């Protein structure tokens, strides 16, 4: 199959925003609302009051950083601060400013050539979702009874039941019971608040496809799909792809898949996935024996986390690049962390060198890099809810050196097309040092990362790069080197440092 992916994503720099925690605008009325203090520690259920107009009012900040695309965590009406419990798929949460605030955000972002991708939660809804609530009220008589997986015997007997478990029922679920047996319906991960949608039902399929198409026509630039593997039906996602691309052929479809994803990346379902496998490899290489796998209890992600030396990391990178078509690799959603993981700096035990090296790799590797809000100023946090802190807008609290490093890397990527669309060449992997080249036409760059705690003096084979003899230009980092007989000679790297060289 001929795989076609969105052109703009190949050049994109993403920034992930958790709307309740990024910024709040005085234009959103909050009189009488009970909100947690903005600078207080995050809690699982508390609201801080961030909104979409807050994002609008800080668009200058994003543009100054170099961001060209925003990925927003869910924004639809919901009773949770993360909004993965969808009440209404056609209404932006009033706490975020409603549909008009989102319309303004799209207008302002697009005027600045910044794309906007929404988080789509299509596997499950919520207890407050109208169709689910209708069944709770009417039982087997509800027209929506086929929208979910209900215990029909329980419905037909009209036994009184509800979606809010008693202490005894919750204890039964916590001890390994499932919501279908205990409460009478199936829920994602047996979380009572998340009734699973029955996507075998024609009406449900049409509803979700219409939602996807509606917001594309509204003006969004793509969908990030929450737990799409839970809808174990290729035909559902193939039609989703057809509807979305029919509304906008350049729309981006990226799935939250934590494992190998060839099934979905054949050109007829998703354009890309969140590249957690590369994240895991990078953590293993940069952290080695300091890697704390216990911080990553998310699905089967933990099994991919282990310390890696340079040759093992290089082999892993080669393997992961070989999984997918080059057109897919160019638009993979590459990240160091997200709302579902501890922040990278916390995982790295506050080792800023690890974060800088992680960014260096992220911004020189094939695919679209994404920064999780606040990482650029040194925001830290362990597993949820700690990784969802409010953004501190007092710049006295920022690490400006970190932010400047990121700005330089973003500019490096923007000004060197080979880093965005060039071919990838493994060049060196030994003693904690990994080097690779990116080549596009006459432009060639070499990235060298020293993840070890010792200075390294090395010569790097230049096989396949076709360089003539002479000095190299250092475009990032601090090092001097030259080419002699096709090899990079006399390269000296300080411990835990990296460099980008250009001929």
Walk through the language-model features, giving the residues of each.
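Active-site-proximal helices and loops of the catalytic beta/alpha 8
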Residues: 106-112, 123-124, 130-141, 210, ...
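Active-site clefts of carbohydrate-active enzymes
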Residues: 326-348
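Core domains of carbohydrate- and sulfate-ester-processing enzymes
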Residues: 133-190, 194, 284-285, 293-317
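Conserved, mostly hydrophobic/aromatic
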Residues: 17, 62, 72, 89, ...
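N-terminal structural segment of carbohydrate-active enzymes
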Residues: 1-118, 123-125, 129-141, 146, ...
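Hydrophobic faces of well-ordered beta-strands that scaffold small-molecule active sites
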Residues: 13-15, 70-72, 116-118, 223, ...
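The substrate-binding groove and active-site-proximal loops of carbohydrate-active enzymes
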Residues: 39-52, 85-98, 191-205, 221-231, ...
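Carbohydrate-interacting/catalytic domains
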Residues: 1-18, 22-24, 28-68, 103, ...
